[in-house]
C-alpha cells in the first residue's frame, strides 16, 4: 500500500480535477463528469503531478468516502458527487429520503442558515448525511461541529426532489429554514 500521505495528496488532487477545476491540467469533464484515465495521467504528469494507473486504482479502492468511481470498462473516472463544474449531470434518479437527514456545520454559518436555509452555493447540490456521525465529521472539518436536522420526508412530500449519490450522500437543491431543526 502506498504511504497514506501520497494517497491523501492524490485524493485531494483528484477531487480538485474531477469536481472543481479540470482545466488545471488542461482537460474538460464530459457531460456526466467523466475523464479518460490515460489523458488524466498524461496531463497530470506533464504538469508535474506524479500519477499512475496503480495509484488511481488504490485511491478509488481505499477512499473511505468512496469519492470516486471507475467506469465499467475501467477507462474513465469521475467523482461520485460534489461537483462545482457547471453542466455535469450524474444521471441521478429521484430517491425517497428517510424521515430525517443531517447536515454538519459550525457556529459561524448558523445565522445565515437560519435566515436562508442551506444553499448549494458553488456546488450543484446541498449535501446531506443519513447518519449523525457522518454529518458531525463533515462539520468538524471547519471547527466545533453543530448538527442540523432536516425534515427530509416532509420536504419530499412538499415537492422537493432528493437524489442519492453512488457513495450514499443525499443531494437536494436547497433546504429552506422551515425544514431545519437547529442545535440549542
From Swiss-Prot:
Keyword Oxidoreductase tagged: no
Residues annotated as transmembrane: none
This protein's UniProt keywords: NAD, Transferase
Keyword NAD assigned: yes
GO molecular function, a single term: tRNA 2'-phosphotransferase activity
Annotated GO biological process: tRNA processing; tRNA splicing, via endonucleolytic cleavage and ligation
Pfam assignment, any one: PTS_2-RNA
Name of protein: Probable RNA 2'-phosphotransferase
Originating organism: Rhodopirellula baltica (strain DSM 10527 / NCIMB 13988 / SH1)
Amino acid at each position: 500500500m502506498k504511504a497514506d500521505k501520497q494517497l491523501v495528496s492524490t485524493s485531494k488532487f483528484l477531487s480538485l480535477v474531477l469536481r472543481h477545476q479540470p482545466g488545471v491540467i488542461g482537460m474538460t469533464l464530459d457531460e456526466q463528469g467523466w475523464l479518460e484515465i490515460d489523458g488524466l495521467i498524461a496531463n497530470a504528469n506533464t504538469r508535474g503531478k506524479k500519477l499512475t494507473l496503480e495509484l488511481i486504482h488504490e485511491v478509488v479502492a481505499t477512499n473511505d468516502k468512496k469519492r470516486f468511481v471507475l467506469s465499467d470498462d475501467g477507462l474513465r473516472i469521475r467523482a461520485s458527487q460534489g461537483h462545482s463544474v457547471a453542466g455535469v449531470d450524474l444521471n441521478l434518479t429521484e430517491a425517497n429520503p428517510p424521515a430525517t437527514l443531517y447536515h454538519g456545520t459550525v457556529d459561524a454559518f448558523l445565522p445565515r442558515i437560519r435566515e436562508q436555509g442551506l444553499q448549494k452555493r458553488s456546488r450543484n447540490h446541498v449535501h446531506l448525511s443519513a447518519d449523525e456521525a457522518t454529518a458531525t465529521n463533515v462539520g468538524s472539518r471547519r471547527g466545533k461541529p453543530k448538527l442540523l436536522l432536516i425534515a427530509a420526508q416532509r420536504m419530499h412530500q412538499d415537492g422537493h426532489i432528493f437524489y442519492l449519490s453512488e457513495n450514499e450522500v443525499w443531494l437536494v437543491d436547497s433546504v429552506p429554514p422551515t425544514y431545519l431543526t437547529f442545535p440549542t
